[in-house]
């Protein structure tokens, strides 16, 4: 059982990948990447929160008190996340029914159903761990049921806590080594035995950091960006990617909320 707790100390965060094409997202996942499409009656789910592209063309976040207010404005509608970070609902004839309005630099974005009941668009990735690249002998588990695959800014993994996606696991091991199991080669931080009671955290500048019980930095991804909210996604293809900062999110108090556009910020 993953030990995923809210980290109550000051945080800072980051992950970077070139844009790429993605096939239609599978129903039941909790994120949508640039180029992916949520088909009619498709769902993105996280706990009690369910984002549905309804057959009446309305995009609704159930239990999150938000909708696109596009009911009966089209047929066979689909939701797409563009490579400029904009969510777009298109009619079956290809015409645009609704757009989020948040656009930024071209890149690889992620729209995530947040566990607090918001749909959040995170800007281009700033760091990735790809187990298809040589570096560690392949380490494979048996078929592992899908559980938690997200780590947000301010959260930590510790004591064999893990993120899982299909047959892949990212584990913050008790020996202080961060290991991504699965893929052709797997991946590790090579920090075995370098500390005690180590934990992994994602800060608010998009940086992954392993610290020991004295809060000494054992390892970091060494990529950081502007201050904001980031997310580490262990994707179904086994690649762990940090996206952020957030540029748009739904809000129950308003139809939509814009968060600052992505620029090259100073560290």
UniProtKB/Swiss-Prot annotation:
GO terms for cellular component: extracellular region. It is found in: Secreted. InterPro entries: Bulb-type_lectin_dom, Bulb-type_lectin_dom_sf. This is Mannose-specific lectin 1. PROSITE patterns: BULB_LECTIN (PS50927). Keywords: Disulfide bond, Hemagglutinin, Lectin, Mannose-binding, Repeat, Secreted, Signal. GO terms for molecular function: D-mannose binding. Its main location: secreted. A motif (Carbohydrate-binding motif 1) lies at residues 54-62. It comes from Colocasia esculenta. Beta-D-mannose binds at residues 54-58, 62, 66-67, 173-177, 181, 185-188. The keyword Repeat applies.
């Amino acid at each position: 059982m993953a030990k995923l707790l809210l980290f109550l100390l000051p945080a800072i965060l980051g992950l970077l990948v070139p844009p790429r094409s993605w096939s239609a997202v599978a129903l039941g996942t909790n994120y949508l990447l640039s180029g992916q499409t949520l088909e009619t009656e498709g769902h993105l789910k996280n706990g009690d929160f369910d984002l549905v592209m309804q057959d009446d063309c309305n995009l609704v976040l159930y239990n999150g008190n938000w909708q696109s207010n596009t009911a009966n404005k089209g047929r066979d509608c689909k939701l797409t996340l563009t490579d400029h970070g904009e969510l777009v609902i298109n009619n079956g004839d290809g015409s645009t029914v609704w757009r989020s309005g948040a656009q930024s630099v071209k890149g690889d974005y992620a729209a995530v159903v947040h566990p607090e009941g918001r749909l959040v668009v995170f800007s281009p990735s700033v760091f990735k761990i790809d187990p298809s690249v040589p570096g560690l002998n392949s380490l494979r588990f048996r078929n592992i049921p899908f559980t938690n695959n997200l780590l947000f800014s301010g959260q930590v993994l510790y004591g064999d806590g893990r993120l899982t996606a299909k047959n892949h696991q990212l584990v913050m091991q008790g020996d202080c080594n961060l290991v991504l199991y699965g893929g052709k080669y797997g991946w590790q931080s090579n920090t075995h035995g370098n500390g005690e009671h180590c934990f992994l955290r994602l800060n608010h500048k998009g940086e992954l950091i392993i610290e020991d019980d004295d809060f000494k930095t054992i390892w970091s991804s060494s990529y950081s960006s502007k201050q904001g909210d980031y997310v580490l996604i262990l994707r179904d293809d086994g690649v762990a990617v940090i996206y952020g900062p957030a540029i748009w999110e739904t809000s129950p108090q308003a139809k939509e909320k814009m968060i600052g556009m992505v620029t090259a910020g100073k560290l």
